[in-house]
Amino acid sequence: MTKNYAYPLDLSWSTEEITSVLSFLNLVEKAYENRVEAALLLKSYQNYKTIVSSKLQEKQIDRNFERVSGYSTYRAVQAAKAKEKGFISLEN
């Protein structure tokens, strides 16, 4: 895993959309590097899904993000859904 990496962003997104996607990806990073509130991650994921509505694009972003960072958005969301309340930590 490398600390200096490019986020998988679509340059056609608005500044607000990019901010929402980055917020979600930052929370995924936080889940792996420390811990994050499950409800906060799920709320951010809902916002993310309004921007990235297709499953194909979501999978591509997850795959690209995991390739460059080592962190899976899918695994983070699944852990948050299983926990619902409290904090999750996916530290390696």
Curated annotation (Swiss-Prot):
Gene3D superfamilies: BH2638-like
Domain of life: Bacteria
Lineage: Bacteria, Bacillati, Bacillota, Bacilli, Lactobacillales
NCBIfam families documented for this protein: PRK04387.1 (NF003353)
Taxonomic source organism: Streptococcus mutans serotype c (strain ATCC 700610 / UA159)
Family: Belongs to the UPF0223 family.
Matches recorded under InterPro entries: BH2638-like_sf (IPR023324), UPF0223 (IPR007920)
The protein's name in its UniProt record: UPF0223 protein SMU_1141c
